[in-house]
């Protein structure tokens, strides 16, 4: 592989040039089979053929597919990757949803996008009956394409057309559909190609051969993982899929991985392995890419001093993951999220909010022009909601969030307003706020002292209706009204 990676012109170029011409014999994707022992390898040649099968299948199933939304509702699997390319190259709009959300959340998102088809893995994540009742005729298995002959590909994707929808948590209690185009993707690929070149020229350990392999435990419906699906074909790298954290060490042992995209919680686990002398169970893993929440700089420095490379990233779904990268292993910059890349404009406004402008910025929020106008100003600057400072060397340091979205160490985003609305349904609660405390979701509740047990029971019931990562794990009671500002708004600090 050449040190200079040629960024593809689009999704069509990614398949026809990168997969079929440049790296047909490279391993594209690995995963552990259902027996828990066998490693399945799919080369780029096979991958491209399956993408062609998916394109042919979708065009037959949805003859007027141009612009139609096709939903993926599945755990991490090879077929998810095939479908992602296939939907786009068939002319559809790719929609990735979190299969572990409650039915209330999924019902809202599905109702908003009005899917033509839903490709799903058939697993009951808690709302299978509701899904079948509402969308039964539109459900298809993830491997629906397997008996279809490979079809012809055409470059049918307009560079500025709506290419995909990915939902992101919002502070209003409702998720928002982020509209992304091929132009957004290609802008992001410029950054990730430079990341790959940086690894090649500066980071490759002695004796390590190319191409590299990347382990991912993050869900494919999340942008931090999805960018790997789109950014590795130009480099001919392999993506090792792990779908369950309980299988992490098993899969890592079976599939050698050089690099891993990780939530902070898993970086801490690897750090503990290092401290306990259990590095061998990592099977040669040496580079960790981390985003979503801050990491202890002392921990990062110690990892670096013991042969690991930890790259911190700052990006958003709204920018196709493009953003700020930190490659330094220097102690004074360990707490920085890094420096902005050269392909995008960045600034800190008068409040210290990070603003981004460039081809990576989304088209807007789906069917929500008001929310779009709130974050993209008349000059095209996207206001991220994150506050930061910049040092004399150009490194950015996140100092807080302009809004109240809670980012847990697991990388999950939680809207406090959503939980507060649920708690407000309890007659015994006078007022409440939900906040993060010691990496836990904590509810501070003002209620009569003799109603506290009733409130605890209500919180338990609310938790039963929520995904694990959203559950309230700490409750603090106060017999005094919660503090408010001069405008009467509750103070969260």
What role is predicted for each listed range?
Residues 1-61, 66, 85, 111:
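N-lobe entry segment of adenylate-forming
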Residues 24-27, 150-167, 173-174, 203-213:
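Conserved pre-ATP/AMP-binding loop-to-beta segment of ANL
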Residues 41-45, 163-190:
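Conserved AMP-binding A3 loop
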Residues 55-101:
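Conserved AMP-binding/adenylate-forming
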Residues 186-213, 220-284:
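Conserved AMP-binding/adenylation subdomain of ANL enzymes
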Residues 252, 258-262, 270-332, 345:
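Gly/Ser/Thr-rich phosphate-binding loop
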Residues 339-342, 349-375, 395, 412-414:
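Conserved ATP/PPi-binding loop(s) of AMP-dependent carboxylate-activating enzymes
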Residues 358, 363-364, 387-470:
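AMP-binding/adenylate-forming catalytic core of the ANL superfamily
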